[in-house]
Amino acid sequence: MKQIFKTEMKRAMSGKGMVLSILIGTVLGIAHVIREIIPAYRANLTNFYNEFPILSPHSAAETWMAGSPSNLEGFIFFLILPILASLPFGTSYFEDCKEGVIKNIYMRTKREDYLKAKYAAAFLSGGIAVLVPLIFNLMCSLVLLPNLAPLSTMGDNILTPLMLFYKIFFTHPMIYTTFFLVLQFLMAGIWACVCLSVSFLSDYKIVVLIFPFFVQLILHVICTITNHIDYSSVYWVQPGHGIIAWWIPVVYLVIGISVTFFVFMKKGVREDVF
C-alpha cells in the first residue's frame, strides 16, 4: 500500500492536470492582486485615512481573495473549486480503466490497496491544487498590506457576532484565516473524491470531471432560492463570509468523506476490469 500510494502521489503531483489547475487558480489570484490588492495598497499610501479617522486602512485579512465575498475573482474561484480540485487526479481511475493500466496494477497489488491509495492521492492532490493559488494570493496581500486586526464596523467583511470564531477574526485574523485554509483544503479533497467516485457513471471523461461542479452549483442555487446562502459551500469556506453554525462544515465533511469513500471502494472492488 505504501509503495502504490507513493506512485499515485507522484503521478498526481507531476501530471498536466495539477499544472493546469494551479495555473487557472493563480491567474485568478493575479487578477485579484491587480484589481483589488494593488489599489488597496495605493489607497493606504494616501492621506485619506488621516482625513477620515473613523475608517481603517485596508488590511491583508480582509482584502485577499477569500477575505471578502464581494470580489469577482474570489467568487469565480470558489464556484469552480470542484473543477480545480478534480483536475489533478480526480479522473485518474477513469483513465486507468480506459487505458487498461488498471489490469496490470491489479496483477501486482490488491484491489483494496490500490483503491485506498488512489482515494488518498486524489484527496491530497485536490487540496494542494486549490491551496497553492490561495496561499499565493494571501502572501501577495501580506506583502502589500498591513496585517491589521479588522474593524467590526466599516469593514469589507460581513461577519456578525453570530458567526463561528467571530472574536478570533477580529483579534487574530491570521489564525482565523489559517483555520479556513484547512477547511478549503478538506473541501477541495472531498470534491476531488466526488469526481473519483462517479468514474463508474459515464463513458465520457468530461462528464466525470465536471460532475462535482454541477453538484456544488445545484446546491448553491437551492441555497440561494431558499434564502439559505450561508449553507452554500461557495460561501461558507470563505473567511470573509464566515460560518453561521458549526454543524454546516461538519455535515459537509462527514457526508462528503464517508459517502465518496464508501461508493468508490464498493464499486471499485466489484468493477470488472478484465
Question: Which stretches of residues belong to each language-model region?
Answer:
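Transmembrane helix-loop junctions in multipass membrane proteins, especially transporters and channels
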Residues: 37-45, 138-150, 204, 224, ...
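Extracellular/periplasmic helix-loop-helix junctions in multi-pass membrane proteins
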Residues: 202, 209, 222-247
